[in-house]
Amino acid sequence: MAIRLYRAYTPGTRNRSVLGFEELVRIKPRKKLTSGQHSGKGRNNRGIITSRHRGGGHKRLYRRMDFRRNKIDVPGRIDSIEYDPNRNTYICLVNYEDGEKRYILHPRGIKIGDMIVSGSEAPISRGNALPLSKMPLGTTIHNVEITPGKGGQLARAAGAVAKLIAKEGRLATLRSPSGEVRLISQDCLATVGQIGNADINNKNFGKAGSKRWLGKRPKVRGVVMNPVDHPHGGGEGRAPIGREKPLTPWGYTAFGRRSRKIRKYSNIFILRRRRRN
């Protein structure tokens, strides 16, 4: 996908770049497949901030996605490839032979007019959904289920791809985009191929306003806060943090503290932890 670079007409356009939308269709989303959504602004049901740096942004319509891919043995044609403001990948409108229409994540390389199908006897080609038991080793996949029938939960971001590396008994070994290696039931469905829009990481927003359009607010450093707000806060003028090592706003050690529950039931299925950032 082409990346458009801006000239430095203003400070906001200097180094700014956007992705080209040549493969997208500029149409309104299907009304039956959309619904309104409340912007939570990072608050929980009591109004307390649980996810910082969120709020504002443009109003959005939610596109109901088909993560289950449970239209078994019913071929569908890709009618359009559309922009979705709720995720960083594009979406496809699939028109099935029985007349039903659904939105799915856009697999890389899929074009308008291509045919896809779900089922255990589907061919190993991009966009088709099959159980892991029917896929050969080394297959690149996305939208992978963790629990059979629950719908895809792994490898759903733009450019994400997982890899099937082993099968033994009723379990398959999968390498996820984060580097984690884990066991998953071979009855789980997955879609063949990589998610599209892989060049999203090369996009340069250029100015703070572009982030605000997406509902992302500024990240304030703890060292410029008051002591009541952050462990790094306080002091006269530009002061050091006054601690042996950096801390989170809640007093935990920053940069490397494990956030996963120690006694989580699914720990036995994880063969190798994900990479640290």
Curated annotation (Swiss-Prot):
Main localization (coarse): plastid
Extent of Basic residues compositional bias: 51-60
GO biological process, one term: mitochondrial translation
GO molecular function: rRNA binding; structural constituent of ribosome; transferase activity
Any one GO cellular component localisation term in the record: chloroplast
Pfam families associated with the record: Ribosomal_L2, Ribosomal_L2_C
Region Disordered, residue ranges: 30-60
Subcellular location per the Swiss-Prot or TrEMBL entry: Plastid, Chloroplast
Top-rank taxon, per record: Eukaryota
Keywords: Chloroplast, Plastid, Ribonucleoprotein, Ribosomal protein
Subunit structure: Part of the 50S ribosomal subunit.
PANTHER family with a match to the protein in the record: LARGE RIBOSOMAL SUBUNIT PROTEIN UL2M, RIBOSOMAL PROTEIN L2
HAMAP family from the UniProt entry: Ribosomal_uL2_B
Family: Belongs to the universal ribosomal protein uL2 family.
Name by which UniProt lists this protein: Large ribosomal subunit protein uL2c
Gene name, Swiss-Prot/TrEMBL: rpl2
